[in-house]
A protein has these predicted regions:
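Cell-envelope/extracellular polymer assembly enzymes that use nucleotide-activated donors
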Residues: 63-66, 94, 254
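Acidic donor-binding segment of Leloir-type glycosyltransferases
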Residues: 82-129
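Long helical/loop segments within the catalytic core of UDP-sugar-dependent glycosyltransferases
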Residues: 37-40, 48, 121-144, 167-239, ...
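Short, well-formed alpha-helical segments that are part of the catalytic scaffolds
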Residues: 47-55, 74-87
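N-terminal membrane-anchoring/stem segments of glycan-assembly enzymes
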Residues: 17-61, 197-198, 206-210, 378
Length: 428
């Protein structure tokens, strides 16, 4: 009979129903090592669904806003940012560009723009005092020359949409904040920008989740983005101004912590529809910029916690090497056996995750497939940053220790007549 014949053949082949029931169980068990690479999806979902946005903020006007732009050798970008600020729908405002002793045409361009619009003023920078880093010093000079009830510190390599300032002031008031900072859209144009920048920005986004920043009860959980910091003058003065962070490499992070210690409220929002910036334009600039900031900024993110500060190098290794485990395991196993299956699954999950990140950053999604290269490069930058930062950072004639405090001037070789090239991330 057909039924019995069928039954016999199944039994004879050794594929009993009991044996078949074990196959998927074994497969699922073998894939369990890949589960850690599902966790980032949960973090990404949380980040996407708890992201305060300037789009929700009301439009505001009224108080004079002093927009302060520290600039050193920014001739290629200064006109763009100035014109974008002047196109703001917010009224009233004044715009002060602090020329930090530029050797290019920055001052000339600003003078031309000032002749076109009376709201623009050029503030010639004074010599850098001992114990000060460039950007805090430029910001303080801009503050001293300003008249506004509100102060906006923004970078020269940013571009503002017309509603950015009005919505930012609206959010500052609606949230009752003493410091408003935003995350702009990060423009990634070249190959290395698109491969490496997502790795670093994800680490920052997970470390400083906006929901955590906005309800922070601990100093370690607050941050500010130096590309855009809006503060009432009264709150800024009460927190000690940028003078309180004059010797800090990560002056924006240190300023947020200073505000928190002073009992001030910080609000962080996404502004990807209203502001954009491009930090680096080459692999060399990217490596140099993050090498200076990554380790020292990581240590600064755990103020008064020496044990966690000491663990920063390990945190950087774990943060980037996490993504290298699946592809390395896949290469070693050739995809064979249980470990190979788990490695293949983990690699696939990681690739999907980074493709989603690329889409979120408006990068072609296929760059997500290159995540092992990005993670490896970021890991190398982290190692380089640790090596340099743990010893001494030399930048524009001064030395900085791991605490970020100036260790004094460096002797300059007589043959050196030019300053190092301007780094997009670095203070001017």
């Amino acid at each position: 009979m057909p039924w019995s014949r069928s039954s016999t053949s199944w039994s004879d082949s050794g594929c009993s129903s009991s044996a078949l029931s074990q196959v998927p169980v074994v497969a699922v068990t073998e894939l369990l090592p890949a589960l850690p690479w599902l966790v980032p999806f949960a973090s990404l979902f949380r980040l996407a669904n708890t992201r305060p946005s300037l789009s929700d903020a009301p439009l505001a006007e009224g108080s004079l806003v002093s927009v302060i732009i520290p600039a050193r050798n920014e001739s290629t970008t200064i006109e763009t940012v100035v014109r974008s600020v002047l196109a703001s729908t917010y009224r009233p405002l004044e715009l002060l560009v602090v020329d930090d002793r530029s050797t290019d045409d920055t001052a000339t361009i600003v003078q031309r723009l000032a002749a076109e619009d009376s709201r623009v003023r050029l503030v010639p920078g004074e010599p850098l005092p001992a114990g000060w880093y460039g950007k805090p010093w430029a910001c303080v000079q801009g503050y001293r020359a300003s008249q506004g009830e509100l102060l906006l510190f923004t970078d020269a390599d940013t571009r503002h949409q017309p509603e950015l300032l009005a919505r930012s002031v609206g959010a500052l008031r609606a949230e009752g904040a003493d410091l408003l900072t935003v995350a702009p859209r990060q423009l990634c144009v070249t190959f290395w920008e698109r491969v490496v920048m997502p790795q670093i920005w994800l680490l920052l986004a997970l470390r400083y989740h906006p929901a955590r920043v906005n309800r922070a009860s601990r100093e370690r959980d607050v941050i500010a983005n130096g590309q855009f910091i809006l503060v009432p003058r009264e709150s800024y003065e009460a927190a000690g101004t940028h003078e309180a962070v004059r010797g800090e490499v990560a002056e924006d992070l240190a300023l947020a912590q200073t505000f928190h210690r002073a009992g001030k409220r910080i609000h962080f929002a996404f502004a990807d529809h209203f502001m954009e910036t491009r930090m680096y334009r080459s692999l060399r600039d990217l490596v140099e910029g993050w090498s200076k900031n990554m380790y020292l900024g990581g240590r600064r993110s755990f103020p008064g916690e020496p044990l966690l500060q000491a663990l920063v190098p390990l945190m950087l290794v774990v943060g980037f090497a996490f993504w290298l485990v699946p592809p390395v395991a896949l290469a070693l196993t050739g995809g064979r056996g249980g470990l190979g299956a788990a490695a293949a699954a983990g690699t696939g999950l990681a690739a999907l995750f980074w493709m989603l990140i690329a889409l979120g950053m408006r990068i072609p999604p296929w760059y997500g497939l290159l995540y092992p290269l990005g993670a490896l490069t970021a890991l190398g930058i982290g190692a380089r940053s640790t090596w340099r930062g743990a010893r001494k950072v030399e930048w524009r004639g001064r030395a900085y220790t791991a605490s970020g405090v100036s260790a004094g001037p460096l002797a300059r070789p007589a043959s050196v007549s030019r300053r190092p090239a301007r780094d997009r991330r670095d203070p001017p």
